[in-house]
Amino acid sequence: MRLFRSPLAALAVVAGALLLYGCSDSSTPTGPGDDDPSGDGSAPQFNSRAAPGDSARAFLSDRQFTELRLEVDYMEGYEPTQAGLDSLKAALERHLAKSSITIGAPTSIPAQGDSTYSAEEIRTLEDEYRDHVTQGGSDTIWAYFLVLDGKFTDGSVVGLAYYNTSMAFFGETIREITGGVSQPSRTKVEATVFRHEFGHNLGLVDNGIPMQRDHQDEAHGAHCTNDQCVMYYAIETTDFFGNVFDGTIPGFGEYGTEDMAAQR
């Protein structure tokens, strides 16, 4: 759900499902649709601090960018599983019109040692550690994953999309809900949450691209009514993985697939 369009970053929590919306810190915000933001005939600029879903078409089609690269940073001790990242790549390759999708080798960054992280702290960490952003005139759109060594201030949240190309995941929360007796594997939880949060930045469920058929759970914003779809609202929370998840990594569903195909 697109709740905020102010020049201030804002946080919305709807029934435990969280989306964080950011804005440009530039005095002249620009976006992927700006033909000539500088007015001097130079290549279009790209705003990597827009709201989740704002760059959905740039991800889905090859009209502006033919390649996707994902930068992955993780705090020491919380490296994401390769199988979880491979599962995400396979899903993106099925749905995105890109000649190449590359997930870079995860890079370790210093653990901060904080038990929780606020929205502002997450943005600050990205400013410090993110190496690659999308450049105007390039064939490559860059996305960013940040895996933290603590929890979000709302401890039930597993991951979030907080800018149009940026997603964060809470390593300590994932650790607590995986690997134990009767708990799912870390790989399957990561694979599921990676898809879900990337789905927000693909504009799914009326969060940047139109629905071909109505499947929005309006009570929970940009989430699907189908509880077998990876965009089901509860997937962002620990309760889902503790009580509902059967180990099957959900796909984007028939309706979500239709929505993405219409943009290719």
Residue ranges and their predicted role:
Residues 168, 172, 250-264:
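Short, cationic low-complexity segments
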Residues 133-209:
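Active-site-proximal segment of zinc-dependent metalloprotease catalytic domains
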Residues 181-256:
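The catalytic-center signature of Zn2+-dependent metalloproteases
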Residues 27-151, 261:
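Propeptide-to-catalytic entry region of secreted or membrane-anchored zinc metalloproteases
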Residues 2, 132-136, 220-223:
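A general structural signal for short secondary-structure junctions and capping/turn motifs
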Residues 1-11:
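Bacterial N-terminal signal peptides that target proteins for export
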Residues 64, 137, 163, 224-225:
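A short, structural micro-pattern
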Residues 19-22:
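C-terminal motif of bacterial Sec signal peptides marking the signal peptidase cleavage site
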